[in-house]
Amino acid sequence: MSAIDGLPPLRDVIRRHDLAARKSLGQNFLLDLNLTARIARAAGPLDDVTVVEIGPGPGGLTRALLATGARRVIAIERDERALGALEEIAAHYPGRLEIVCADAMDFDPTPLLGGERAKIVANLPYNIATPLLIGWLCTEPWPPWYDMMVLMFQREVAQRIVAREDDDAYGRLAVLSNWRCETNMLFDIAPSAFVPQPKVTSSVVRLAPRAAPEPCNRAALEQVAAAAFGQRRKMLRQSLKSLGVDPARLAAAAGIDPTRRAETVAVSGFVAMANELNNIRNTKTQT
């Protein structure tokens, strides 16, 4: 990409700005420019699109997004050491890169969007990847402020996001993710593509928000999934007791045999049980 955008190779950028990756920040820098370009392309056409990127580091993916045609990139970076490298990219793409020095866990990018929708594209820091995703999935109101997420995770986490019922990786994260989004595993990235090399393979996942997910109280859905998968080897008639209602009633509302286990229940079944739980609680409140 240095031949395309005229910027120096990433290894030179890292050395010049003393950007040794820090484990405490969950940093693993992706230096393969073919892969950063592939991630950018996975987000679809970027012309006239604002992209929110988390943890850009030395800016490999940032450069790919801009070179691919993103009208504007909002790069949220906590590590002040990376700001100089990002400012060089901003100078190369005048008016198209906005750098925000902030912790993504505490920062709301929506005021910067001015009512526009965006796409989220990021090689997420491993140590905050799942909490960030859950926060985005819990956005209210829905549909959210983003049209798409293309995100990199440790492969084990990626599998938990895209899993379906009867998959070993199916659990609470899959229920929440697939209730609100269409999820797809796109491709894997070997440890050798990163500096430093992580011990595990990474995977890129695309999540496209559903315009109209099945109506459901999100808090109730999270509670039902937590109870069911908290004792995933037990039957629903046992695992759902912690909710303080009759598990058989929840299962019946979903047309599910209460002797089944959580891992066999589709997202629609969890939605039905959550709605029944919410109805029961609302009835108790009114009496």
UniProtKB/Swiss-Prot annotation:
**Where, by residue number, does S-adenosyl-L-methionine bind?**
N28, L30, G55, E77, D103, N123
Q: Where in the cell is it found?
A: Cytoplasm
Which keywords, in A-to-Z order, does the entry hold?
Answer: Cytoplasm, Methyltransferase, RNA-binding, rRNA processing, S-adenosyl-L-methionine, Transferase
Give the EC class as a word. transferase
As recorded in UniProt, its EC number(s) are 2.1.1.182
This entry carries the following GO cellular component terms, namely:
cytosol
Q: Name one Pfam family in it.
A: RrnaAD
Reaction(s) catalyzed by this protein?
Answer: adenosine(1518)/adenosine(1519) in 16S rRNA + 4 S-adenosyl-L-methionine = N(6)-dimethyladenosine(1518)/N(6)-dimethyladenosine(1519) in 16S rRNA + 4 S-adenosyl-L-homocysteine + 4 H(+)
> SMART domains annotated for this entry?
rADc
Domain of life per record: Bacteria
Gene Ontology MF terms: 16S rRNA (adenine(1518)-N(6)/adenine(1519)-N(6))-dimethyltransferase activity; RNA binding
Q: What role is this protein assigned?
A: Specifically dimethylates two adjacent adenosines (A1518 and A1519) in the loop of a conserved hairpin near the 3'-end of 16S rRNA in the 30S particle. May play a critical role in biogenesis of 30S subunits.
- UniProt record similarity statement: Belongs to the class I-like SAM-binding methyltransferase superfamily. rRNA adenine N(6)-methyltransferase family. RsmA subfamily.
Q: By its UniProt entry, which PANTHER family does this protein fall under?
A: DIMETHYLADENOSINE TRANSFERASE, DIMETHYLADENOSINE TRANSFERASE-RELATED
The name on file for this protein is Ribosomal RNA small subunit methyltransferase A
Q: What gene name is given for the protein in this entry?
A: rsmA
